[in-house]
Amino acid sequence: MSDSHLTAFDKASKAGFIIALGIVYGDIGTSPLYTMQSLVENQGGVNQVSESFILGSISLIIWTLTLITTIKYVLIALKADNHHEGGIFSLFTLVRKMSPWLIIPAMIGGATLLSDGALTPAVTVTSAIEGLKAVPGLSHIYQNQTNVIITTLVILIVLFGIQRFGTGFIGKIFGPVMFIWFSFLGVSGFFNTLGHLEIFKAINPYYALHLLFSPENHRGIFILGSIFLATTGAEALYSDLGHVGRGNIYVSWPFVKMCIVLSYCGQAAWILANKHSGIELNPFFASVPSQLTVYVVILATLAAIIASQALISGSFTLVSEAMRLKIFPLFRVTYPGANLGQLYIPVINWILFAVTSCTVLYFRTSAHMEAAYGLAITITMLMTTILLNYYLIKEGVKPFLAHLVMTFFALVEFIFFWASAVKFMHGGYVVVILALAIVFVMFIWHAGTRIVFKYVKSLNLNDYKEQIKQLRDDVCFDLYQTNVVYLSNRMQDYMIDRSILYSILDKRPKRARVYWFVNVQVTDEPYTAKYKVDMMGTDYMVRVNLYLGFRMPQTVPRYLRTIVQDLMESGRLPKQEQEYTITPGRDVGDFRFVLIEERVSNARQLSNFERFIMQTKASIKHVTASPMRWFGLQYSEVTLEVVPLILSDVLKLPIKELVPVEDSEA
């Protein structure tokens, strides 16, 4: 990593500051919409809260933001960048060589992040639209929750519908809008606290600890389930590291934290001033002057949409990384934007839309959604803590110190998990079931890959080089193609899948001028694009290792085109002049890609469990993108050949010949 790149990544700028507000802080920045409402409603309403309860609640929020968001994520996790990229899968690629079992927390963390994220657009948009109940001219319409639901669904339909076109055209306004949003949070919160400056006593952690064990707290330790809502967006700070750079997060986080803390303090001051009024509105909107409410609702809705957009984009990135790490099925990925970071996965987009819409229809109100929200993200944070522990050790921190620091955070997060576990029976089971389904798919995909590696036999290419040369020169066979390309998942030195050599020599001898054996390896670095070539001492057999970062598209034909030109220019590969062509001077022949799919035969070597894994994986493949799409072969000549997973499992079955009886013997 060059010093210039490091400096650019770590330094801040005015533009970077604004961009960070629009990308990184959407989730945590919209938490004031519903966190205080959840605390008050779980206490029994505004008229049931006391000054000590409010002080304790604000103190818990402040210290939760400080311990988890500021110390763990901003000060520790942001250091764990994988070539400027963050997120749980980037962190996993940094430490995966330290222990094979680390794939487990990576899969669990990724699954829970995706599942809990499906709830975020529902909670934030519904909370914003419910603010219309406080608008004098619209309150009679939106007191009917059905109208809130309809409006929310319309916004979600538009939001998910525009994903296919890319969001670069509206992304430019995200930063300025969120700057206005955070400024409003800070200013309105500050003015609301002027009548109750004693609210700032909440900075003292004594009030937080006192509330946890106070009889005034009707929920005891389980109040932390609502407190945790204030910091659910902390994981996004780390996940979006690569989009904005570490320096911009360092500079923008103090501003964001100050604004949201002032907003919580302002809502708390309003509650203290109105606890005997009997008003049962969301404290966030109720604390705003009535003549400004409609504008605040519009601003809150925009902030909720931006938060949802950031989450949707983050989900696409998370899934694409999982696919390239071979722990998730392959789905079609498109790039509607001008850069690789703006990707779109249609299947994931509409699954998210379906889950989010069903969440709105099932829970109906933001209060009911809040009861289920946050449970899965506590698990994500715990999994990140486990991986961070290994990262610190890898970076030279003494194991005892690393274990001590991460055990502290794990203990804090486990307490939040325990406090949030009560949400399971109040709707939390929805995100848990979704997370388990995602983990199941990841496990099947990962285990299936390991089984294939276990049973597929490999042969040495050098042992068959002479046969392939004879086939190449044998005019008795028609020319199958000028260039035949085999994509292999497993190619260690000269060892290659037996099924590939079987396809060339046995199944139907494939005569070609050049045989290509291509293996794509996903690197720990996000944006690697390198290759290594071995001509094997010939001009007709080419071993190609493509080294692509886990965020790079695996469009093999485009890379291969460059490699062919390089080899011909260096004289390692003879030019393939074309007698008939509409392109004058064309010196590259035609290509055919052969894809080999291993399917489970009636293999006796497979255990029942392994058979279940492989059959389930085969079923999942029916709804996933084909390898042809994944490797960018839609416009190439492709042959798909199916072979049994275990070629050697062809046993002679006993059978007797019936000898016809002659008439004379009858």
Swiss-Prot record:
It comes from Streptococcus pyogenes serotype M5 (strain Manfredo). GO terms for molecular function: potassium ion transmembrane transporter activity; symporter activity. One of its GO terms (cellular component) is plasma membrane. The lineage of its organism: Bacteria, Bacillati, Bacillota, Bacilli, Lactobacillales. It holds the Pfam family K_trans. Its main location: membrane. Keywords: Cell membrane, Ion transport, Membrane, Potassium, Potassium transport, Symport, Transmembrane, Transmembrane helix, Transport. This is Probable potassium transport system protein Kup. It is a multi-pass membrane protein. The chain crosses the membrane at residues 16-36, 58-78, 100-120, 141-161, 165-185, 221-241, 253-273, 292-312, 343-363, 373-393, 399-419, 424-444. InterPro entries: K+_transporter, K_trans_C, K_trans_N, Kup. Disulfide bonds: none annotated. Transport of potassium into the cell. Likely operates as a K(+):H(+) symporter. It is found in: Cell membrane. It catalyses: K(+)(in) + H(+)(in) = K(+)(out) + H(+)(out). PANTHER family: K+ POTASSIUM TRANSPORTER, OSMOTIC STRESS POTASSIUM TRANSPORTER. The gene is kup. Belongs to the HAK/KUP transporter (TC 2.A.72) family.
